[in-house]
């Protein structure tokens, strides 16, 4: 639903904005506690319900959303626990993360049916009965001339759906489960959505696709602002998918906008994408097929975790190259050892990547574009009034690096780099977007169908530009991204001025 400002989007925006405003304007623990009690009434004012069965239910959900936005955990449903319980652990100027990242607010869940095939009133009672003829379980009979499905026999194969000439039979599925390429969502004993964290890779497609806003990820807005207020030198590193996310925001306006939030400096993660491209190009040339039959890209954490989790025997075939986020963070910390790095991008899975032991010291905070918009609104940053200073434009990365934001862009960048390094080398490529298709690609690779290939996996359909933390219509963003790529002075990763620093970043 990105690009559509729904009531769910509005609620999320208001929560992020109010949490950011509270963090900027308040200092005392007691004041935070008071505001946490008051925010549900500020966000849902008045006496009448607006979206749900009760205004009290709406406010209870907001209270949990506020906690999660501050990095805190959901409260137990069977105990009386204050909204501010555990606040003292959250009021810190450092990364605060207590698993799980992705949470279902149970009383916000609609308990949608998992999967149902049913006959609608559009059934014409035709003579051919194709629905009955194709059913392998004899689950379809006719009552008063109309098709009827015996749900106890139906196996949800969908053949009747495809055969009906009137499209009178429909297949409905719980949206969050349908969006999950890992099959990680099932029902609890009350029919509400429940996440199997052994399967979940935090792509957060379930969150994007839940029409009731019951699925929420934890945030680091609160801790980031504490760090800024403490006077830390916080440097924002921004993923190239930022293009078109903020109305009226040009690349050259972004730096000033971030300064108004308190950031000391801003860099583009595309710098690290160039270095990642070079790493993966070299690895591919050295290892495929001499050591491994194929190589998968590394930059999407949800894809790489999925591949290693479901295909452990092929785990060595997934590139060990550091991601653009980590490479950019390390490059900045080489120049500014005391800097604190905040990655800002389209991806919630980056929050987990940044919590890994190998990455924790490099990346201090992670925000999505949606969360960043909350900061802009809290500080009343007017994009139209920002100076469009050409000196503030990003100009240190290649067009190929900016292309990482769209599906197919990572593989194309690596191929172009290999052509520069070894013009005679032929590289076969296969790309997949969405974890379900990524899984199919890996199954084919496991069967030997992609030997010699470079495989690009993107957990989000469309790539990062359509990530769970984006705001804009992905189709429009892709068009703007292509324009942004064409404006780059450098075209291929091998032209990066930071190539000599690459060896220093491997430690």
Task: Pin down the residues of each PLM region.
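Iron-sulfur-associated redox domains of electron-transfer enzymes in respiratory
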Residues: 1-77, 87, 217-507
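Extended, highly charged accessory segments
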Residues: 60, 83-87, 95-101
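C-terminal edge-of-domain segments
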Residues: 78-80, 104
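N-terminal [4Fe-4S]-dependent radical SAM core
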Residues: 91-120, 137-138
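Gly-rich Lys/Arg/Thr-decorated short loops/hinges at beta-loop-alpha junctions or inter-strand turns
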Residues: 110-118, 141-146, 187, 205-207, ...
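Conserved, function-defining core regions and hallmark residues within catalytic/recognition domains
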Residues: 123
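Iron-sulfur cluster-binding cysteine motifs and their immediate structural context
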Residues: 128-151, 159-196, 201, 205-220
